[in-house]
Amino acid sequence: MLLALRRKAIHGIRFSSGKCGQNLSGSTIGPKFTSDKEVEEFLSKSTWDVREYVPSSVDEKLIPSEETVVRLLKISGLPIKNIDQIQIRLANQLSFINRLHNLPVDENINPNHARIIERNPTPLDYEGLIKGIASQQKSDSLGEISGSWDPTKTAAVKRDGFFILREGLLKGRD
C-alpha cells in the first residue's frame, strides 16, 4: 500500500532497506519516519474534510457563460464538447475557492512557515550544525560510501591526497 502511495502522491519519503525516512537531499522538515506504521498514522490524520467546503448545490451566479467556457476550451486546446457539464464543474470549483477565501485566517502565523513544520523553528547555530555533522550517517543507497571519491585521482602530480602545484604556475600571481 505504501509504495502505491509513494508513486501517486508522496515524493518526500524514501523507502530503503526496510526503513523509511525523509529524503535528505534538501532540508529536513519535521521528524523522520522510522516505520511504515508511523507513515500510515501521519497520512491518516484528518485535519479537515474537503467535502465540508464542496457545494451541495450549484450557485447560478457562479456558472460561467457558454461563450466564456468555449473561449477557455479553445485557449487550452481542449475539445469543445460537454459544455453544460464543464460549466457546472467550473461553478463548483469557483464556489470551493470562494469558501476557502472566506475561512478565518490567524494573522499571527508567519506565512513563511505555512508548511508541515513547527510554527516557530529554532534557528541554526554553530554547535547544532557540528552535532548534526558528527551524528550524520552515510547512506549506501545514495552512493555515500566512505573513501569512494578521490578529488586528486586525475591529477598528474599529487601527494597524500593534496594537489602539488609547480612553481611555474604560480608566477605572475600576487
Swiss-Prot record:
Where mainly found? mitochondrion
In short, the EC number is: 6.3.5.-
Cell compartments where the protein resides: Mitochondrion inner membrane
Q: How does it sit in the membrane?
A: Peripheral membrane protein
Q: Which GO terms describe its cellular component?
A: glutamyl-tRNA(Gln) amidotransferase complex; mitochondrial inner membrane
GO molecular-function term, one example from the UniProt record: ATP binding
Supply the alphabetized keyword list: ATP-binding, Ligase, Membrane, Mitochondrion, Mitochondrion inner membrane, Nucleotide-binding, Protein biosynthesis
Q: Name one GO biological process term.
A: glutaminyl-tRNAGln biosynthesis via transamidation
Q: Which chemical reaction does it catalyze?
A: L-glutamyl-tRNA(Gln) + L-glutamine + ATP + H2O = L-glutaminyl-tRNA(Gln) + L-glutamate + ADP + phosphate + H(+)
Q: Which domain of life is it from?
A: Eukaryota
Q: How does it assemble?
A: Subunit of the heterotrimeric GatFAB amidotransferase (AdT) complex, composed of A, B and F subunits.
What the entry lists under HAMAP family is as follows: GatF
Q: What else is known?
A: This protein may be expected to contain an N-terminal transit peptide but none has been predicted.
Q: What role does this protein play?
A: Allows the formation of correctly charged Gln-tRNA(Gln) through the transamidation of misacylated Glu-tRNA(Gln) in the mitochondria. The reaction takes place in the presence of glutamine and ATP through an activated gamma-phospho-Glu-tRNA(Gln). Required for proper protein synthesis within the mitochondrion.
Give the similarity note. Belongs to the GatF family.
What is the name attached to this protein's record? Glutamyl-tRNA(Gln) amidotransferase subunit F, mitochondrial
Name its species. Answer: Kluyveromyces lactis (strain ATCC 8585 / CBS 2359 / DSM 70799 / NBRC 1267 / NRRL Y-1140 / WM37)
Query: What is the name of the gene encoding this protein?
Result: GTF1
